[in-house]
């Protein structure tokens, strides 16, 4: 698996795994049949990314959901950063995605974990329209009913997003200035700063003019490249090894 490949320093294998992971996420999004995620307990990292790519999600109230990759020195690379960039663009007021994007950036960079399905909606891991059930015994029944309802109502997959406006280099610069202040105040480490910069670079669409239009593949490629750059660093590898051994994060 990914951890084994990393520990064996097989970065080429990791790169292939990430590409396949992204293809799977996109397959969930653009499947010709409806996809409904049934969440009970934990949906962390890649699990959360799969949930975000489904047409609907049904979650038990006490589910823990989040993109926690930054805690081990990485960033979401299964489409998680791309999804937040897309959400910011789709819900932008006056065509500017940055006001929303800066909140989404904090969610990802701080590895914020929703400790309930309601909080997952607040953090935009779940949609406002997603269903929350109180009893986990009802979960599969409700999820199946939603999938059947979508299928029976003439379901069509969403159109591919080919014109996503991004915050570009101005957005990156604004976030980077905030990261500099945090670093100078010793609130984050040098490696935290690097991780934050990589996340901002991806979510803002790279070094482009603000308002430039990109497609999902552009954002996914930025994700994959940034992930591979981080996973090749000694400090990220130390964080992963420490977490696998102790179950606790390492600040280095």
What are these regions (language model features)?
Residues 1-6:
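Gly-rich Lys/Arg/Thr-decorated short loops/hinges at beta-loop-alpha junctions or inter-strand turns
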């Amino acid at each position: 698996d990914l951890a084994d490949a990393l520990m064996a320093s097989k970065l080429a294998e990791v790169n292939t795994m990430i590409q396949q992971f992204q293809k799977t996420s996109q397959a969930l999004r653009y499947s010709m049949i409806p996809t409904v995620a049934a969440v009970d307990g934990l949906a962390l990292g890649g699990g959360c990314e799969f949930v975000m790519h489904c047409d609907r999600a049904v979650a038990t109230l006490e589910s823990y959901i989040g993109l926690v990759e930054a805690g081990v020195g990485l960033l979401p690379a299964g489409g998680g950063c791309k999804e937040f960039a897309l959400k910011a663009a789709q819900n932008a007021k006056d065509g500017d995605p940055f006001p929303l994007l800066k909140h989404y950036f904090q969610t990802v960079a701080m590895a914020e974990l929703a400790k309930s399905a309601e909080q997952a909606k607040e953090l935009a891991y779940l949609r406002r329209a997603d269903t929350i059930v109180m009893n986990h015994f009802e979960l599969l029944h409700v999820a199946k009913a939603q999938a059947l309802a979508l299928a029976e109502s003439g379901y069509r997959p969403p159109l591919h997003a080919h014109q996503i406006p991004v915050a570009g280099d101005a957005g990156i610069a604004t976030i980077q200035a905030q990261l500099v202040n945090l670093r100078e105040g010793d609130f984050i480490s040098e490696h935290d700063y690097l991780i934050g910069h990589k996340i901002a670079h991806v979510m803002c669409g790279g070094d482009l003019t603000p308002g430039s239009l990109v497609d999902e593949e552009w954002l996914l490629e930025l994700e994959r490249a940034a992930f591979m750059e981080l996973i090749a660093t000694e400090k990220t590898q130390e964080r992963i090894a420490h977490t696998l051994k102790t179950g606790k994060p390492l600040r280095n």
